[in-house]
UniProtKB/Swiss-Prot annotation:
<dbReference type="GO" id="GO:0070490">
    <property type="term" value="P:protein pupylation"/>
</dbReference>
<feature type="region of interest" description="Disordered">
    <location>
        <begin position="1"/>
        <end position="37"/>
    </location>
</feature>
<dbReference type="Pfam" id="PF05639">
    <property type="entry name" value="Pup"/>
</dbReference>
<feature type="modified residue" description="Deamidated glutamine">
    <location>
        <position position="68"/>
    </location>
</feature>
<dbReference type="GO" id="GO:0010498">
    <property type="term" value="P:proteasomal protein catabolic process"/>
</dbReference>
<comment type="function">
    <text>Protein modifier that is covalently attached to lysine residues of substrate proteins, thereby targeting them for proteasomal degradation. The tagging system is termed pupylation.</text>
</comment>
<comment type="similarity">
    <text>Belongs to the prokaryotic ubiquitin-like protein family.</text>
</comment>
<dbReference type="GO" id="GO:0070628">
    <property type="term" value="F:proteasome binding"/>
</dbReference>
<comment type="subunit">
    <text>Strongly interacts with the proteasome-associated ATPase ARC through a hydrophobic interface; the interacting region of Pup lies in its C-terminal half. There is one Pup binding site per ARC hexamer ring.</text>
</comment>
<dbReference type="GO" id="GO:0019941">
    <property type="term" value="P:modification-dependent protein catabolic process"/>
</dbReference>
<dbReference type="InterPro" id="IPR008515">
    <property type="entry name" value="Ubiquitin-like_Pup"/>
</dbReference>
<feature type="cross-link" description="Isoglutamyl lysine isopeptide (Gln-Lys) (interchain with K-? in acceptor proteins)">
    <location>
        <position position="68"/>
    </location>
</feature>
<protein>
    <recommendedName>
        <fullName>Prokaryotic ubiquitin-like protein Pup</fullName>
    </recommendedName>
</protein>
<feature type="region of interest" description="ARC ATPase binding">
    <location>
        <begin position="24"/>
        <end position="62"/>
    </location>
</feature>
<dbReference type="GO" id="GO:0031386">
    <property type="term" value="F:protein tag activity"/>
</dbReference>
<comment type="pathway">
    <text>Protein degradation; proteasomal Pup-dependent pathway.</text>
</comment>
<keyword id="KW-0833">Ubl conjugation pathway</keyword>
Amino acid sequence: MAQERIFGTGSRREDEPDTPAPVDPPVSGAAQAQRDMQGTDDLLAEIDGVLETNAEAFVKGFVQKGGQ
């Protein structure tokens, strides 16, 4: 056991990297806001599409759920 610590002959595998994998740099606040805005715009566009094709069914479904 002591020899394993001194000489490094323990259970370490040869294919293990010595350094951790690189991580992506943190995203800036402006980039995060832009990505969130794009997601919101996509969702609103989808809602508009549903309303254009079948507004009556959308309203009935909304009223049946109690308007919540």
